[in-house]
């Protein structure tokens, strides 16, 4: 028997991949449904990998994960927006920065990366001509894609269930069983589950689960972010993911995170954000006016204003410190 802890995108994805093999797999979730944590509250970016430092594990996994989602899309009929990403500069003085970004994309093996002329850019995204955005050049990253995170978790869990995986909801892990330094199972509020392998996919609580097994090699610090969901009636001017690399763009960026942008969804809502704030309380998913104001600094669509806000949600993600 193999046991997987929690049903976010990591837990559901791992369970579904393992269900290809003749294994007895149990997934334990303290909530009453899949994607109850950070996996339900994020902007659904399948990153191209250009933003990552070359040579790092993160850079490699960004690109490999992007390719993996293409397989999942075909196998699970996922709702995916193949939008690609355009990073636009408006002045010749910004060209060295754009070339540097292009070189990083090449080093990270990002497929299809290309520097475009103004004419090529407007042909690829006609909305830029309509809004009158000045363009000197642009970096085109065609592998950027957007998913609906909650729907993706549901699809993974449903397929895993068809393949024989058991999901136990409303089961909170209170301790991890060990014997001679090896994990042998977990103790939940509904009883003991024996398993020679336990996969820790507990998200922001993964360090707490690891500690139960005697592993205190790392700690996880919560980082929350606010995302503004715009009304579907306000159709985005740009169906593609567009970033204008202006001085205002760099000034508005949150110094604690590379994140924060303007993202269309497969259902064509526009998402603004997220912000990024480290918090000591892992249960803190509150939103403040400061967070809301920050999301508007991510807006580069002249046809969208704060009057189009439909909903706000907070996502508590995490950073690992070793």
Language model region names:
Residues 23-25, 112-113, 198:
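Hydrophobic anchor at the start of a short beta-strand
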Residues 44-124, 259-260:
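Dinucleotide-binding Rossmann-like beta1-alpha1 core, especially the glycine-rich loop
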Residues 10, 33, 205:
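Conserved Rossmann-like nucleotide-cofactor binding loop
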Residues 16-20, 46, 76-80, 175, ...:
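Active-site substrate-recognition segment that forms the wall
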Residues 19-41:
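Glycine-rich FAD pyrophosphate-binding loop
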Residues 53, 60-63, 88-97, 139-158, ...:
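Short beta-strand to alpha-helix junction loop
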Residues 139-197, 205:
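Helical element adjacent to the flavin cofactor pocket in flavoenzyme catalytic cores
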Residues 2-27:
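N-terminal Rossmann-like FAD-binding beta1-loop-alpha1 element of flavoenzymes
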């Amino acid at each position: 028997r193999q046991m997987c802890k929690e049903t976010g995108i990591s837990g559901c994805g791992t369970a579904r991949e393992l269900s290809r093999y003749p294994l007895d797999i149990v997934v334990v979730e303290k909530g009453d449904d899949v994607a109850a944590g950070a996996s339900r509250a994020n902007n659904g970016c399948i990153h191209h990998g250009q933003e990552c430092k070359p040579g790092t594990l993160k850079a490699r996994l960004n690109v490999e994960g992007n390719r993996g989602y293409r397989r999942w899309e075909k196998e699970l009929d996922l709702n995916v927006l193949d939008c690609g990403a355009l990073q636009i500069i408006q002045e010749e003085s910004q060209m060295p920065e754009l070339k540097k970004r292009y070189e990083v994309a090449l080093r990270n093996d990002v497929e299809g990366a290309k520097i475009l002329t103004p004419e090529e850019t407007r042909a690829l995204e006609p909305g830029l001509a309509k809004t009158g955005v000045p363009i000197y050049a642009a970096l085109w990253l065609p592998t950027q894609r957007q998913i609906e995170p909650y729907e993706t978790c549901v699809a993974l869990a449903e397929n895993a269930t068809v393949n024989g995986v058991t999901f136990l909801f409303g089961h909170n892990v209170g301790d991890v069983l060990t014997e001679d330094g090896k994990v042998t199972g977990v103790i939940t509020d509904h009883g003991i589950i024996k398993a020679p392998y336990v996969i820790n996919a507990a998200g922001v609580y993964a360090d707490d689960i690891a500690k139960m097994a005697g592993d205190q090699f790392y700690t996880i610090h919560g980082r929350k972010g606010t995302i503004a969901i715009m009304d579907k009636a306000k159709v985005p001017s740009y169906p593609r993911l567009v970033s204008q690399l202006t001085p205002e763009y760099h000034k508005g960026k949150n110094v604690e995170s590379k994140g924060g942008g303007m993202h269309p969804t497969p259902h064509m809502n526009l998402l603004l954000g997220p912000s990024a704030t480290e918090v000591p309380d892992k249960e803190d998913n509150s939103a403040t006016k400061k967070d809301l104001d920050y999301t508007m600094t991510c807006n580069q669509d002249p046809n969208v204003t704060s009057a189009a806000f439909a909903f706000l949600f907070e996502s508590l993600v995490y950073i690992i410190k070793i």
